[in-house]
Amino acid sequence: MSKVKADKQSPKENTKAENSDNESIDDTASVATSTTSRSKSPGSRGRRQSRGHSKSKAKRPAYKYDCHLKEDHGQAIFGVSFNHLLGKDQSMVFATAGSNRCNIYECPRKGGLKLIMCYADPDPDEVFYTCSWSYDLKTSAPLLATAGYRGVIRVIDIHRNESVGNYVGHGQAINELKFHPRQANLLLSGSKDHAIRLWNIQTHVCIAIFGGVEGHRDEVLSIDFDLRGERIMSSGMDHSLKLWRIDTPEFKDKIEMSRTFNPNKSQLPFPTIMQHFPEFSTRDIHRNYVDCVQWFGDFVLSKSCENSIVCWKPGQLHQTLSQLKPNDPSCTIISEFNYDECEIWFVRFGFNPWHKIVALGNQYGKVYVWELDPSDPRHTHSSTLNNIRCTSIVRQTAFSRDATVLVWVCDDGTVWRWNRRNAEVHTP
């Protein structure tokens, strides 16, 4: 079995990284834009009704090409993530995950990309698929978690450029990692072994395993915490989306216990929770692999290989998440964001930290950007970013903390930076 799934493969080229920040945008890129409202009336359990289109004027694209470079391993880059935990006055820093490396870049305010660190896994056969940022609770040093084909989670101390934690438990590849939004020591992982695990990276214990009786029946491809860190949404190859709660008394007790647990002083292993039953589950949203999911308040954004991101809500529109009934798979579709030529899996969209802008690439190097109206997600401004040198599959996009920089990574080992033309996106 190949270590990289068929849709993840790309030609290997042993070329050195080259920075292209001096190239002229006028000669290298074309950008098509429009402002549209593509929505579907809310329909229970995936009931589809005709779309409504609003008339609006075209406007300039929000982002402009700045530069790109190519990493010297020449293989596909599957993951990219900005460090949103840094202050407003600190440099914008992001990481890429591809081959057996994680590269850390700085985005200077004047433009360009600056490589500041490269972590190479000791296993040359490793292929990293994902990365996520946190920090050390004792030293405040930035920490980067990464994982992939080998199923081993590495937690890297950026200041020391070395792994300070290695977590083995998943039986197969790990497709995505996410840190808890409020507790920096809690890490979530979703795997090819059909399971999701919650870890405490401070005490190195596995707090919970989500899966089993009513868990995913195939690879878990994407996971996400809600903003309060009380619920988890997961999606996978089984076409399903599942909601898991971690705000119950049992979970709160185990999370608290994990903070002080010392395996060297305990005669028994940590009592890991085995959670077999999700709070909610549905297969009515998508008909193919669901490879990306993120919370949008109490709504959910998810995508499959169907040229559409779906905004939906578990249960009926009037219900809160706490009012969901067990074994009730009903859901309400709020809106759809359509795009072209992205019919392969493991292509993930990016959400800016304040949930106002979504960006997704396709298999031919184009990136679609939607600016959402917080009061009504059915009304959006959309634009398409395109550079004639970018022709490879765009695997993932990411926004800086203030959304002034958009980066994406491709199958040909390239990293692209685009800058916002103005400062209309405000942070709290």
From Swiss-Prot:
Signal peptide boundaries: none
GO CC term, one of those recorded: nucleus
Species for this entry: Musca domestica
Origin: domain of life: Eukaryota
Compartments in which it is found: Nucleus
SMART domains according to UniProt: WD40
Keywords: Developmental protein, Nucleus, Phosphoprotein, Repeat, Repressor, Transcription, Transcription regulation, WD repeat
Bias-annotated ranges (Basic residues): 45-61
UniProt name for this protein: Polycomb protein esc
Coiled coil, from the record: none
Pfam families (alphabetical): WD40
WD repeats: 72-115, 124-166, 169-209, 215-254, 285-322, 341-380, 389-427
Compositional bias (Basic and acidic residues): 1-19
Biased segments, Low complexity type: 27-44
PTM characteristics: Phosphorylated.
Family: Belongs to the WD repeat ESC family.
Gene3D superfamilies (alphabetical): YVTN repeat-like/Quinoprotein amine dehydrogenase (2.130.10.10)
Region (Disordered): 1-61
Lineage: Eukaryota, Metazoa, Ecdysozoa, Arthropoda, Hexapoda
